[in-house]
Amino acid sequence: MFRALPFTATVHPYAITAPRLVVKMSAIATKNTRVESLEVKPPAHPTYDLKGVMQLALSEDAGNLGDVTCKATIPVDMESDAHFLAKEDGIIAGIALAEMIFAEVDPSLKVEWYVNDGDKVHKGLKFGKVQGNAYNIVIAERVVLNFMQRMSGIATLTKEMADAAHPAYILETRKTAPGLRLVDKWAVLIGGGKNHRMGLFDMVMIKDNHISAAGGVGKALKSVDQYLEQNKLQIGVEVETRTIAEVREVLEYASQTKTSLTRIMLDNMVVPLSNGDIDVSMLKEAVELINGRFDTEASGNVTLETVHKIGQTGVTYISSGALTHSVKALDISLKIDTELALEVGRRTKRA
């Protein structure tokens, strides 16, 4: 089946349509790439330019001369198929973004998928193909794979962590690759996780440095409540706590004052033991103290091996920077159908 995404694209400067001209990229970028029909939509962001990110990735690859290897080796009129191949098991992600990139390079390329974002693939599975001008397929190949491999790696780890963390929800953090914040967080959603704050703008998060500068947890919370009221802002507020005493201080403040606080972070309350196990007694005590008055978030010493035990403490969320800051890319490839390419080459007397 052929499934195309509904968004507008024009012939990209990197694409080859007739003569091999090197054309520089347009400075015009569209922030609102159409994503309404996607099964898993990218998270909202007021300034993130997804089209611009795609264009930057293509531009840094093409440089000022374009693909000199393709120009030297691939006939400009050669048509071919190329198949996506999973080279290991995992969760596939980035299918929607791949279609956008192919359309950015050459809107005439036809992309067909046999899986959806979030589906499991196994080693050796051909999970999609692209048909059209061979030159333009190869131009898009590396950029498409760079995004898909990273996103699929994030989605694969997220799926494993989310399943193990149940009934708690797994979150990523702001520890994303620079410039890829939305893409990384999109992959987390595809993998079955939930998003933490997108940036510094959409949630107040009072951490240790803020608490130290304000003179304590209570004073920091009071300052935040005053700021939000004065500026008529309605956004979530989270405060970091590191000890049971700090949890008690937060709860005491909340019992005496109307507050915008929505979540309490329980940081490093998971203690590693010498035998490789973890002690979650402090975390469990904190969750019981809070007793559902606020959402809770466990942070620190979260791994695939520890997340299940953490999730059994009753905590609402578990956050892990490892989902995005040091993820292993999923090994996938895109290979041109050699026999078809040779057949076309023979017909055009170029093989």
UniProtKB/Swiss-Prot annotation:
SUPFAM superfamilies: Nicotinate/Quinolinate PRTase C-terminal domain-like, Nicotinate/Quinolinate PRTase N-terminal domain-like. It catalyses: nicotinate beta-D-ribonucleotide + CO2 + diphosphate = quinolinate + 5-phospho-alpha-D-ribose 1-diphosphate + 2 H(+). Its EC number is 2.4.2.19. Substrate binds at residues 142, 173-175, 197, 207, 240, 267, 299-301, 320-322. One of its GO terms (cellular component) is mitochondrion. InterPro entries: Aldolase_TIM, NadC, NadC/ModD, Nicotinate_pribotase-like_C, Quinolinate_PRibosylTase_N_sf, Quinolinate_PRibosylTrfase_C, Quinolinate_PRibosylTrfase_N. Pathway: Alkaloid biosynthesis; nicotine biosynthesis; Cofactor biosynthesis; NAD(+) biosynthesis; nicotinate D-ribonucleotide from quinolinate: step 1/1. It comes from the Eukaryota. GO terms for biological process: alkaloid metabolic process; NAD biosynthetic process; nicotine biosynthetic process; quinolinate catabolic process; response to jasmonic acid; response to wounding. Induction: Triggered by wounding and jasmonic acid (MeJA). One of its GO terms (molecular function) is nicotinate-nucleotide diphosphorylase (carboxylating) activity. Expressed in roots and flowers. Involved in the biosynthesis of pyridine alkaloid natural products, leading mainly to the production of anabasine, anatabine, nicotine and nornicotine, effective deterrents against herbivores with antiparasitic and pesticide properties (neurotoxins); nornicotine serves as the precursor in the synthesis of the carcinogen compound N'-nitrosonornicotine (NNN). Involved in the catabolism of quinolinic acid (QA). Belongs to the NadC/ModD family. This is Quinolinate phosphoribosyltransferase [decarboxylating] 2a, mitochondrial. It comes from Nicotiana tabacum. The gene is QPT2a.
